[in-house]
C-alpha cells in the first residue's frame, strides 16, 4: 500500500512516540513534533485517513490514536531498509569475534549477552549451520571411562565435544594429524560429505586409527543436525520494569518454548528482519550470522509489540558488520 511522504512522517511519529512513552498521537502533538507546514485540521484528516487504512486505531479512553500491528509492520519495514550501526555499547563485539582461543559456544553466548544488555531485551541465538564453518585444526584427546575429547579449530573459535569411544593416545594423535592434513581450509560440510572417498583411497594408511575417525564423523554428523539454542536474559530486568505484566508473561512463555523459538529463528532471512506480532503479541527482530554467505546461526531479540525496533536493529547491524569484516 502506497503512502504519501506526509502520511509516512505522521505514522513514524505515532509509532516512535508510542514506543517511547506510550503516548497516543493527536493532531496537536503531530504539529508540535514535526516541521510540517500544515494546519491542525489537515493533520486531523491525515490521522483519520491512516486510521481508515488500518495503520492507526483510536483508543476509547482518549481522542488520541496508537499504531496497529499493520502500522508497526509498515514502520519496521521502512526502518530496516537503511539500518545504521551506531550502538556504542557493542564496542566489545569485535574483540569477542577475533578471539580464536574461545569456543564457538562461548563466542555465541558472549555476543547474545552483550546484545541483551545493550537492548534491554532477552536475546536468543540458534546455531544450526556448523557445516559452513571452515576447519583449521583437529585435536583428539583420550579420556577415562571410554571417552574422547574432540577439539576442532574453526574460523569462529573451536568446537569441543566429548564422544563415547575408547582409543589410544597414539591413534588419537594419528587421527588428529590425518584430519588436519586433509581437511584444513575446508568446510565441515565438505569433510562430512567427502570423508568416505578419502578413506577408501587410504585404507592401508589409516587402518590403525580408522575407528577413531569413524566415531568422530558419526558424532559430528549428529551434531550438525542439531539446533543449539543459547538464551540470554541480561536485559530483562529493565524490560520487566518498563513493560506491563501481561507482555512480560508472554515473552517469558516464548523463551521457555524451545520448539517455538526454533520455528521463529529457522525463518530468519539473510538480512535484518522483524516478525511484528498481531496486537498484544510478542515481536522478534532477527539477523543471520553468515559464514561465506551461508548461515551459521540466527540471532533473535524478543520483546513486546511496542519495542525499540530502531535500537535493536542498530545493535544487530553492529554484529553483522563485525562478522563480515572477520570473514574477509
Q: Which residues fall in each region the model found?
A:
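Short helix-capping/hinge SLiMs at alpha-helix to coil transitions
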Residues: 16-23
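Contiguous, well-ordered alpha-helical segments that form the cores/surfaces of helical PPI scaffolds
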Residues: 11-16, 285-287
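Intrinsically disordered, acidic Ser/Thr/Pro-rich low-complexity regulatory segments
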Residues: 83, 87-328
Amino acid at each position: 500500500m502506497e503512502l504519501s511522504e506526509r502520511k509516512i512522517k505522521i505514522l513514524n511519529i505515532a509509532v516512535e512516540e508510542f514506543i517511547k512513552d506510550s503516548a497516543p498521537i493527536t493532531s496537536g502533538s503531530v504539529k508540535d513534533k514535526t516541521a510540517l507546514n500544515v494546519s491542525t485540521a489537515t493533520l486531523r484528516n491525515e490521522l483519520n485517513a491512516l486510521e481508515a487504512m488500518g495503520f492507526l486505531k483510536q483508543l476509547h479512553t482518549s481522542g488520541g490514536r496508537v499504531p496497529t500491528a499493520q502500522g508497526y509492520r509498515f514502520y519496521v519495514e521502512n526502518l530496516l531498509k537503511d539500518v545504521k550501526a551506531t550502538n556504542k555499547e557493542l564496542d566489545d563485539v569485535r574483540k569477542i569475534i577475533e578471539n580464536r582461543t574461545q569456543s564457538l559456544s562461548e563466542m555465541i553466548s558472549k555476543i547474545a549477552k552483550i546484545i541483551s544488555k545493550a537492548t534491554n531485551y532477552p536475546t536468543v541465538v540458534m546455531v544450526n549451520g556448523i557445516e559452513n564453518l571452515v576447519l583449521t585444526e583437529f585435536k583428539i584427546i583420550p579420556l577415562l571411562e571410554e571417552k574422547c575429547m574432540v577439539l576442532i579449530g574453526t574460523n569462529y573459535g573451536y568446537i569441543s565435544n566429548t564422544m563415547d569411544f575408547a582409543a589410544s593416545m597414539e591413534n588419537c594423535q594419528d587421527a588428529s594429524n590425518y584430519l588436519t592434513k586433509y581437511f584444513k581450509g575446508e568446510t565441515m560440510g565438505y569433510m562430512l560429505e567427502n570423508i568416505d572417498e578419502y578413506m577408501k583411497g587410504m585404507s592401508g594408511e589409516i587402518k590403525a586409527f580408522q575407528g577413531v575417525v569413524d566415531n568422530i564423523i558419526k558424532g559430528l554428523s549428529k551434531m550438525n543436525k542439531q539446533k543449539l539454542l543459547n538464551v540470554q536474559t541480561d536485559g530483562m530486568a529493565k524490560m520487566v520494569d518498563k513493560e506491563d505484566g501481561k507482555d512480560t508473561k508472554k515473552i517469558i512463555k516464548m523463551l521457555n518454548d524451545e520448539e517455538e523459538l526454533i520455528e521463529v529463528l529457522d525463518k530468519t532471512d539473510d538480512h535484518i528482519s522483524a516478525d511484528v506480532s498481531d496486537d498484544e503479541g510478542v515481536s522478534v527482530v532477527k539477523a543471520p550470522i553468515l559464514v561465506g554467505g551461508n548461515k551459521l546461526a540466527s540471532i533473535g531479540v524478543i520483546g513486546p509489540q511496542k519495542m525499540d525496533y530502531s535500537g535493536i536493529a542498530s545493535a544487530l547491524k553492529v554484529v553483522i558488520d563485525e562478522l563480515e569484516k572477520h570473514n574477509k
